[in-house]
């Protein structure tokens, strides 16, 4: 397979400037990740451990096979969205740790409530993150392990947590349907499990509860007293002894957190789970070029072009790419490669999308679907070309072919936004709405319906036409005063931290970690069979 040769000079001033700019962004990302990893803060953590409980991340660590990685989902979910009175983040990590890890040799989705964050209660973004984890489990046919320690819905936010289709109730809907599909559901009750949340263990295939610590009840002692006048302790109402000896809601009684996690590992060991997909996996080889050089590839000035092959060469095995149609539709690079020995089809932006690029992309997607090869999209796109000439040539029709191919492709799809993600280009390059198994962003990325300058210019033109149509005038200073806040709005709303807080992605990643993250996602996808693709009608 042809080896991609780098034309970059890592000793050049431009490379050094680019690398310094990216390194600053990565340092900021790491700092934010360190903060949210602490959960609810020192006081809450001390209170948690004083009760004999392991900290949430320690629970996850003990559940995993020793030395194996944890592919965490959306660690910065809810960032700055629910500020406390002092301005600090009230819901770091959205109050729940979620991701994919190996347990007793089996890839599993783990959802772990963080009771140090507002008692593990569910904010709107907590629900969204929990549902996203279940979606990952369903798509990849991964057993779910729920480490439950939650006070249920966050009551001040109940209108955004309880009533709608994709609110709290959807968790239990998903549990029931995944169980029906043979996707194991295992609950470990390590603290409170109240009200509707009680259905997490009650609807699991197998449930473990920690004695004198875990509780399960639809109505807690205060509600029971208010409703019936009965005075009862939490343990007598819904403790481990009650539910493993009398009610049968739980199956195994653990003596402490460590024992409970050991029982969970035993439960997974008896699932008789095997990977389903039949990819032709070969021996992995490291790229010939250093991943750390990715820092210097992307220009600090986003207006400067670069060759996306420089990025591909630092991600794929042996820096090898068998490029498809290299002389046609040059603004889209397509080709076959391997990542940690797993075959992939790469689709990477190298400029704006023209009709030729879109047709090439659609053709390549057809090939990958026929061969059942996963697709990897490297997004850096301002959109499809516009103008009278390209419209006459059918850019909408040809762009629709690519969008249709992306939408209907049944192979696992993975998207990494390495630069811009604007307008319909987001759709053609497998944005969130098009169901990629995972979508990550680099810290330099931007995502909006269009760029801030373009949006400000469009709206300013509309306003100027309205003023002048009524016989008025609009000075250059007035126009700039109108456009400046729009630019600021688009910059703020298109920023990766704004996006990741709202779960528009599965996390912001260090560019140097791209290959590792992609390999973990690909490996997880091998647990599900790859379905045949049936394309819709292509307008010819």
Predicted regions and their residues:
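Ligand-binding clefts of soluble mixed alpha/beta catalytic domains
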Residues: 1-540
């Amino acid at each position: 397979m042809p080896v991609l040769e780098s034309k970059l000079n890592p000793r050049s001033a431009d490379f050094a400037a680019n690398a310094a700019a990216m390194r600053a962004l990565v340092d900021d990302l790491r700092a934010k990740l360190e903060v949210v990893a602490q959960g609810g803060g020192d006081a809450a953590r001390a209170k948690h451990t004083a009760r004999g409980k392991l900290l949430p991340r320690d629970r996850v660590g003990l559940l995993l096979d020793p030395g194996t990685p944890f592919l965490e989902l959306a660690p910065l979910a809810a960032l700055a969205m629910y500020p406390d009175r002092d301005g600090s983040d009230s819901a770091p990590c959205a109050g729940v740790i979620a991701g994919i890890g190996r347990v007793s040799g089996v890839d599993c989705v783990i959802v772990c409530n963080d009771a140090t964050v507002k008692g593990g209660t569910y904010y709107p973004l907590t629900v969204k993150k929990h549902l996203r984890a279940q979606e990952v489990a369903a798509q990849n046919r991964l057993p779910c392990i729920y480490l439950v320690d939650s006070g249920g819905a966050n009551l001040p936010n109940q209108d955004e947590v309880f009533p709608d289709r994709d609110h709290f109730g959807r968790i239990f809907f998903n549990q029931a349907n995944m169980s029906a599909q043979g996707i194991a559901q295992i609950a470990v009750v390590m603290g409170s499990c109240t009200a509707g949340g009680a259905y997490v263990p009650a609807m699991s295939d197998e449930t473990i509860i920690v004695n004198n610590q875990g509780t399960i009840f639809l109505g807690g002692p205060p509600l029971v007293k208010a409703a019936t006048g009965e005075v009862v302790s939490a343990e007598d109402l819904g403790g481990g002894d009650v539910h493993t000896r009398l009610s049968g809601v739980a199956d195994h009684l653990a003596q402490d957190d460590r024992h409970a996690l050991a029982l969970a590992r035993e439960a997974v060991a008896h699932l008789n789970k095997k990977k389903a997909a039949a990819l032709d996996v070969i021996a992995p080889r490291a790229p010939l070029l250093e991943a750390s050089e990715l820092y210097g590839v992307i220009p600090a000035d986003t207006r400067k072009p670069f060759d996306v092959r420089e990025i591909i060469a630092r991600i794929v095995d042996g820096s090898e790419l068998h490029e498809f149609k290299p002389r046609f539709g040059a603004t889209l690079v397509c080709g076959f490669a391997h990542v940690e020995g797993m075959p992939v089809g790469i689709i990477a932006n190298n400029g704006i999308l023209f009709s030729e690029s879109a047709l090439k992309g659609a053709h390549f997607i057809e090939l990958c679907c026929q061969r059942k090869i996963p697709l990897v999209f490297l997004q850096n796109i301002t959109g499809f070309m516009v103008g009278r000439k390209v419209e006459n040539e059918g850019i909408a029709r040809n762009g629709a072919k690519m969008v249709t191919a992306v939408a209907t492709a049944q192979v696992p799809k993975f998207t990494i936004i390495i630069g811009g993600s604007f307008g319909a280009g987001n759709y053609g390059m497998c944005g969130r709405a098009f169901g990629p198994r995972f979508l990550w962003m680099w810290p330099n990325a931007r995502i909006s319906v269009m760029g801030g300058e373009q949006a400000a210019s469009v709206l300013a033109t509309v306003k100027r036409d309205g003023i002048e149509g009524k016989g008025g005038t609009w000075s250059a200073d007035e126009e700039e005063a109108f456009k400046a806040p729009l630019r600021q709005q688009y910059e703020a709303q298109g920023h990766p931290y704004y996006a990741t807080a709202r779960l528009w992605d599965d996390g912001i990643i260090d560019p140097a970690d791209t290959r590792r993250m992609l390999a973990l996602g690909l490996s997880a996808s091998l647990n599900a069979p790859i379905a045949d693709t049936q394309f819709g009608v292509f307008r010819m």
